[in-house]
């Protein structure tokens, strides 16, 4: 998969909290944790779960997640 965003942080999901509409995802990147809020639908479509390897994609206005 190719993507134009240059700020990509590979990590592992350490926590995911599913709300009615949104999902709060915590990703361990080295010694740090990146927090992301995405739609619940996106989390379900990606089948995100604790322990999954993901890439946090940081843009100036948002943080997206990509699952390999």
Regions picked out by a protein language model, each given a short descriptive name:
Residues 1-68:
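Non-catalytic connector elements of ABC transporters
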């Amino acid at each position: 998969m190719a993507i134009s965003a240059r700020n990509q942080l590979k990590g592992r999901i350490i926590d995911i909290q599913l709300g009615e509409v949104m999902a709060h995802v915590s990703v361990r990147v080295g010694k740090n944790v990146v927090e992301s809020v995405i739609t619940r639908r996106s989390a379900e479509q990606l089948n995100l779960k604790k322990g999954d390897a993901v890439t946090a994609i940081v843009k100036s206005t948002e943080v997206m997640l990509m699952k390999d």
